[in-house]
């Protein structure tokens, strides 16, 4: 019996790395995703979206949100690197899963897609609040728009929105423009103004508002116009990414296949922009796009190749760093003209924009300031949609040694002149005083 226990323990130790599928900086798409559903029928009703993920190499693990065996970790190691929650009405997750464990999941650098709907539970609302998003407090409210609705909803309550106010970012939504409007039916949310990490990806039109479509308005709605966000994203400081949608139907086969014509527009589209929208958005949230890595930070004196242990004030130096972007299949050279380096001690004494050879190498040269102390080379790069880069390397700077100063300092020439003039004047005065009567 003892031998059997030891064997099981050994097998667990060897299998654990295979189960964890921890996020790899060198291979961002080698990932396993847990999909939590209210009903397993969503697996077929949202099959187009799930199949696009599978076709890109993701391993999806479908489970009911109330499954008693739910767990994100085993033996202190995460089993998944991505989490999709399509369970808006779930009041309580099964197993060891709760809002805190999901927050810890994101804090560990992993990614989340959270989708709410009408009558979203307090659990789902709480998770969204943790991510900087607040859903309408009225659980029966939906987004209504009497001017930007889909013409297929012309005789309805105008809750099927044809939205086309998309974030202008090739990194988040891809380089190919989404021509057709995105169909949306769901709840509105607003962004927490104190959270600068959250961004609207799909916004409502100025004529939209959030209210119960089955009852008359007795007071002005709390959420109106462009302040309503339909889909938002967040990139945490640890580069974990989160997508928050107010509609599960947004990802459904029915809306993906549906034709669309926006009210008041002559343009008709055989297919909505939903598939392109959710596909491109999923590429971003799962780090298939906009994922940077940097390394090989090198510095040395001009004309040398070895990195010194210390610099002297007014030394001429060269600095370089390599930056690459994940293309979805391989690392490609990152090309940009806004990467900067700081030569930093309490504040930046030198701030230089780096030149690039378009092969991933960014470089510059500058003179060490006439200040000695402990400095840092710092590269802090933050750009919309891209992972944040933060690199630093410490280096001391010393003053001149006593035998390194110039023999005669040009700026001291006036003082030299004053000294010799005084001596000459004293000699003349003494001669005149002693020998002249």
Swiss-Prot record:
Residues 1-24 form the signal peptide. InterPro entries: DDOST_48_kDa_subunit (IPR005013), OST48_MD (IPR055459), OST48_N (IPR055457). GO terms for biological process: plant-type cell wall organization; protein N-linked glycosylation via asparagine; unidimensional cell growth. The keyword ATP-binding does not apply. It is found in: Endoplasmic reticulum membrane. Residues 25-414 are lumenal. Its main location: endoplasmic reticulum. Disruption phenotype: Embryo-lethal. GO terms for cellular component: endoplasmic reticulum; Golgi apparatus; nucleolus; oligosaccharyltransferase complex; plant-type cell wall; plant-type vacuole; plasmodesma; plastid. It comes from the Eukaryota. It is a single-pass type I membrane protein. Residues 436-437 are cytoplasmic. The chain crosses the membrane at residues 415-435. PANTHER family: DOLICHYL-DIPHOSPHOOLIGOSACCHARIDE--PROTEIN GLYCOSYLTRANSFERASE 48 KDA SUBUNIT. This is Dolichyl-diphosphooligosaccharide--protein glycosyltransferase 48 kDa subunit. Pathway: Protein modification; protein glycosylation. Subunit of the oligosaccharyl transferase (OST) complex that catalyzes the initial transfer of a defined glycan (Glc(3)Man(9)GlcNAc(2) in eukaryotes) from the lipid carrier dolichol-pyrophosphate to an asparagine residue within an Asn-X-Ser/Thr consensus motif in nascent polypeptide chains, the first step in protein N-glycosylation. N-glycosylation occurs cotranslationally and the complex associates with the Sec61 complex at the channel-forming translocon complex that mediates protein translocation across the endoplasmic reticulum (ER). All subunits are required for a maximal enzyme activity. Belongs to the DDOST 48 kDa subunit family.
